Amino acid sequence: MKKLVLKSIDFYRKHISPATPPKCIYLPTCSSYTYEAVEKFGVFKGLYLGFRRFIRCNPLHKGGYDPVPEKFSFFVHKQGKNKQHRRSV
């Protein structure tokens, strides 16, 4: 099944994507991100991450560099938004 999903993404990237104007606001592109996520985490987790990325790929989000995470999580982790609590003296 993994090969079928990866071949489908390849087909999209080679035959469909070039016929449409570039729209992805992220690096790597959503198709590259999904391909890498499927390779790294398997079909279901990879497609889940790809879907989560795809729904964020719109003008309401900033975009930019957004690599496949090192570890899989069902929850969204915002990078660089970790808060450190200070002790009050």
Curated annotation (Swiss-Prot):
SS bond partners: none
GO cellular component terms attached to this protein's record: plasma membrane
UniProt keyword list: Cell inner membrane, Cell membrane, Membrane
Record localization: Cell inner membrane
Main localisation: membrane
Membrane topology, from the record: Peripheral membrane protein
Pfam families: YidD
InterPro entries linked: Membr_insert_effic_factor_YidD
Family label: Belongs to the UPF0161 family.
PANTHER family: MEMBRANE PROTEIN INSERTION EFFICIENCY FACTOR-RELATED
Function: Could be involved in insertion of integral membrane proteins into the membrane.
Protein name: Putative membrane protein insertion efficiency factor
Organism this protein belongs to: Petrotoga mobilis (strain DSM 10674 / SJ95)
Organismal lineage: Bacteria, Thermotogati, Thermotogota, Thermotogae, Petrotogales
